[in-house]
UniProtKB/Swiss-Prot annotation:
Residues 19-245 form a propeptide. The active site is at residue 430. GO terms for molecular function: metalloendopeptidase activity; zinc ion binding. The gene is MEP. Keywords: Hydrolase, Metal-binding, Metalloprotease, Protease, Secreted, Signal, Virulence, Zinc, Zymogen. This is Extracellular metalloproteinase MEP.
Amino acid sequence: MRGLLLAGALALPASVFAHPAHQSYGLNRRTVDLNAFRLKSLAKYVNATETVIEAPSSFAPFKQQSYVEAATQHVKMIAPDATFRVVDDHYVGDNGVAHVHFRQTANGLDIDNADFNVNVGKDGKVFSYGNSFYTGQIPSSAALTKRDFSDPVTALKGTTNTLQLPITVDSASSESTEGKESYVFKGVSGTVSDPKANLVYFVKDDGTLALTWRVETDIDSNWLLTYIDAKSGEQIHGVVDYVAEADYQVYAWGINDPTEGERTVVKDPWDSAASEFTWISDGSTKYTTSRGNNGIAQSNPNGGSSYLNNYRPSSSSLSFKYPYSPSSSPPSSYIDASIIQLFYTANTYHDLLYTLGFNEKAGNFEYNTNGQGGRGNDYVILNAQDGSGTNNANFATPPDGQPGRMRMYVWTESTPYRDGSFEAGIVIHEYTHGLSTRLTGGPANSNCLNALESGGMGEGWGDFMATAIRLKPGDKRSTDYTMGEWAANRPGGIRQYPYSTSMSTNPLTYTSVNSLNAVHAIGTVWATMLYEVMWNLIDKHGKNDAPKPTLRDGVPTDGKYLAMKLVIDGMALQPCNPNFVQARDAILDADTALTGGENQCEIWKAFAKRGLGAGAQYSSRNRVGSTEVPSGVC
């Protein structure tokens, strides 16, 4: 579950952090703790300074050899005995670095958590790479030939029983689909769509390889990939959850919540370079409501999974102006304003991210990609005042080509209640789950932020982007920001500490993670480090307070947007399920690729200040901190 608050019980009452109640679907976490089944961080990341293996003499530059061929050649050199396939989601980022992803195979089946990502520079040489390929003994194919494993229905029933899923499988049957040992289930009730199963291998925690069924079940509040042992039909080896917990009268971009300004009317606010069909068309149909190529926003008071026929305001004159006051009650009385605010914030963020490199080929959320690459049919489903919970929000990120799903809730910690759609930081935080999940490991793989530390960084990226966007013209290095303060009606916000460059106000360092086991708490540490990076870059390059960056040769000219750009580029470089050290290296590599490394000193100083210096070492049980800045970078 990737939501705003779940598992982050640092300051608010327990009720605020409980899993949202759902009227029909949902996993009872008090009985089954999905964190116990999180994937482990297996990857090694070789950064740009460590990639010293020169291309062999037979190597041809880009013009003669494609970047896919160059990357494939590199994988064969590093893992000569491995069999693998190229994942069909490779692309060249707007910084000129190509990203190619590979999946290891065995006996014709995927090893689902064995990945290799290769980043190829403009010169056609390998820039950096991540590797979690399995190096142990590959099982004999005899078990497959003899079909010495359970049938898919047994796997579905085992998954349902072990995780106590609220679905009915008594009449379940399986039908073969395209692909080796791929099935869809019929006769199942309680799911959004028909469950699926694929026979795959999975690297277990003990380093051995298990034949498993990957069972996919979307129960709305949780969209799960469960790896259940194919022989026993009972033992679960890992679980991935895709869910992260005209004229428009709105709080304009940069106003985080009603305490920071008044609503205004904005006209045709889209960026035509990012939203070529505007926000209210998908290239084939022009809409007169909160629907378009990037998102579809509606009310969802019952908390169900249907959305196309849900209520959304309509205006034949395209004048989306509706009354709202923070003192109004109940929230349903201003649902029109809520839907339009959510639609506006999500679309504006889509356009900004597009400018910063999260475009169609990188796996962004668009119904019609207009021939620009990537897979379409995946705008974001935006549910305002979703009835499946309160005091939270969440975002589901399936692979590219399937819609993202954001649920915004009403917050009940104040009188009158407050609507989370009016706090932009919450919307941005949730949407950033989609950004980081699509970029890390590639658009086709949504499994790469499911280890505890990488999941924590997923929360931290959301907080960082939300905080960077709300900076004001008069802000200085000494300015502190909280998260979720307005919606939760809590002056100190919903995190353990405010985001601050003061070690007195916020003392978090890398070794703080040793005592943390919740993703939101870990994310606060990561976002604190990124806040330091941003202010170091602002001190060097200044701060652009406009809603969009000024680019020179693709590089933001100011420190705020440069920090955001490097963070985004780093996501695409880092390996599957990265740790803090690897994500730090990816940001440093992003600077090398984008600027030639002119900001290495500022970035290293920021991380070193918070204990993630050159000598920092990752261990899931005992992280070692360091304040060392490498010699020669400053």
